[in-house]
């Protein structure tokens, strides 16, 4: 039986390094570890190159982006475009990445702060993809909506959080929709066992969302 660690090694060695004839496998592995450990954050080739330089590995920006493309093609990481809600167009910068299997995140994580927020955001993203949605990161003039999820004839907005346990978190998650003035359904998903809707925005428990596809509708 193949373990997650051996599956990871097999994908890295066979599906990426060998297929793409990678000449600097150590750099590729560092980039992959960076992307996995920083799931649900904005991708910056410059930042990744800088982190490699700090580790005494020099890789050019174009090579970093080539390696990211190879990793995405191997289905370890998904890359997600931002969408300007006001301008109604996709943006070719500030993309986010999400690890396709949170087991890889647990293997390679290097952070503790806000870990559950990142895990839940990644879970929600992967579930939306599994349900066939086309997913974007929403950009507003005030900030960001975690997800715009589209099917051919519907669209929804989703914010995700670990727990809505203080007023600042509640205001951040529900308030993110203040600058979204259309009438598509809007949701906040968290681990709270008791949920409370606000101003037409539905608050869902994460487990209920994962178990019942009918809870979200466009």
Predicted regions: what they are:
Residues 206-218:
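Non-catalytic C-terminal interaction segments of nucleic acid-processing enzymes
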Residues 89-90, 145-148, 196-199, 213-215:
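Short, solvent-exposed polar/charged micro-motifs at secondary-structure junctions
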Residues 109-111, 169-170, 199, 215-216:
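Short conserved micro-motifs at the rims of enzyme active sites and ligand-binding pockets
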Residues 158:
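Conserved beta3 VAIK motif of the Hanks protein kinase fold
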Residues 103, 161-162:
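Short, histidine-centered active-site or binding-site loop motifs used for metal coordination
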Residues 138, 162-207:
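Catalytic cores of nucleic-acid endonucleases
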Residues 107, 176, 209-212:
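Generic recognition of well-ordered alpha-helical segments
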Residues 2-155:
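Accessory nucleic acid-recognition modules appended to NTPase machines
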């Amino acid at each position: 039986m193949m373990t997650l660690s051996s599956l990871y090694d097999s994908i890295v060695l066979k599906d990426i390094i060998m297929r793409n004839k990678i000449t600097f496998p150590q750099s590729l592995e560092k980039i992959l570890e960076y992307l996995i450990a920083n799931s649900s954050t904005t991708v910056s080739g410059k930042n990744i190159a800088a982190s490699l330089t700090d580790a005494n590995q020099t890789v050019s920006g174009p090579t970093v982006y080539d390696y990211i493309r190879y990793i995405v093609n191997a289905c370890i990481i998904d890359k997600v475009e931002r969408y300007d809600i006001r301008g109604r167009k996709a943006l070719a910068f500030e993309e986010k990445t999400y690890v396709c299997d949170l087991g890889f995140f647990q293997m390679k994580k290097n952070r503790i702060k806000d870990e559950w927020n990142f895990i839940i955001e990644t879970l929600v993203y992967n579930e939306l993809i599994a349900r066939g949605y086309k997913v974007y990161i929403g950009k507003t003039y005030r900030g960001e909506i975690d997800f715009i999820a589209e099917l051919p004839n519907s669209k929804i907005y989703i914010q995700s959080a670990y727990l809505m346990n203080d007023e600042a978190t509640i205001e951040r998650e529900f308030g993110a929709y203040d600058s979204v003035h259309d009438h598509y359904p809007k949701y906040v998903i968290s681990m709270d066992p008791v949920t409370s809707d606000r101003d037409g925005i539905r608050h869902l428990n994460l487990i209920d969302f994962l178990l019942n596809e009918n809870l979200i509708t466009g």
